Amino acid sequence: RRQRQMSIRDRMEAVGQALAHLDEFRTQEGAILIADLLKRIDRIEAYKQEVIPFEKARTEAIRARIRESLAQLQTEVDNNRLEQEMIFYIEKLDITEEKVRLTNHCNYFREVAASEECAGRKLGFIAQEMGREINTMGSKANNSEIQILVVKMKDELEKIKEQVLNIL
């Protein structure tokens, strides 16, 4: 009987050690996962920065296309009215707001990932909002170089969404 009690105690101790090792492993795995997620957030922001040089050229190309189309019509145009219409059209295609919101979402993602209560669901919701901004940028872009960068952002975001499912 004495030996049996010792055996139970040994078993309890072994289970306790196993649980401690499991907890340590999960903590290490979580740190690696968060580091990977943050690296992907950095990539998304880097791709967003790469969009900037294409924006001015895109706007100028739109203006040139409109002027060229009008020249082909060979009609007199009120230049003030033309400028107003071009500004209106170009503003509809402006992606500044989306870039600002994407930056805010990336910062919030980092903040939540660094917090003690890092919640996978919350990170998932933030990633979903990031996706909306990236998609809107893509639909407004009307530029192949920007589209390529948007696809790269989407690729990173998909990997983030998959990994976030592994966070409790």
Where are the regions a protein language model picked out?
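Amphipathic, non-membrane alpha-helical segments in soluble helical-bundle scaffolds
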Residues: 9-12, 31-41, 52, 56, ...
